[in-house]
Amino acid sequence: KRLSDADELLPFDCGDEDLNNYLFSDALSYQNQLLSVTYYLDNGDETILFFSLSNDKIAAIELTNGFWRKIKTLFPHSKPRKDYPAVKIGRLGVNVKYQHQEKSWGAFILNYVKQWMVTENKTGCRFITVDAYQSAVPFYLKNGFLFMGSQERVRYEKQKGDTVAMYFDLMQIV
């Protein structure tokens, strides 16, 4: 369900205070300012999960030349561009009670967003991007995301920075 002013969010704790605070304190404000849109699922007693999406791009100016060449090879016979459209998963959280179950709610969200962007998207969108927390990188790798260049892989391997830029090419599921 898309978050709205009329919604009273039910209890939620994903084990990450920053994500919890975002859902209860910032998500609606970001949405009202047209910066992102937050969706959530509850069971009548508690919030099971939420995710926030915003527009993004993969841009040449932000990447190494080698990685940008790799991205451009995905578009043979097309006019060269300086960027390609994407949607960013800005926030994603699953209630601790629903984490590490046989059915992965996190994978469910990613698969839902992937299919949604291919079948229901109102604008062009080739990629899904995420600035993954270091601890979440294995989850995103398992779900088909790649590092946005070798420098991001090194950041992960050396545990530099809080997040690692990753992407998923939606043409993998078309």
Language-model segment annotations:
Residues 124, 131-135, 149-174:
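C-terminal "cap" of GNAT-fold acetyltransferases
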Residues 52-91, 157:
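Conserved acyl-donor/pantetheine-binding loop and adjacent beta-alpha core of acyl/acetyltransferases
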Residues 34-52, 65:
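Conserved beta-hairpin
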Residues 1-29, 33, 38:
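Short amphipathic alpha-helix that is part of the acyltransferase structural core
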Residues 110, 117-132:
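Conserved GNAT acetyl-CoA-binding A-motif
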Residues 90-102:
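A short, internal acetyl-CoA/4′-phosphopantetheine-binding micro-motif in the GNAT/acyltransferase core
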Residues 130, 140-141, 145:
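Conserved active-site tyrosine of GNAT-family acetyltransferases
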Residues 100-115:
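Conserved acetyl-CoA-binding loop-helix of GNAT-fold acetyltransferases
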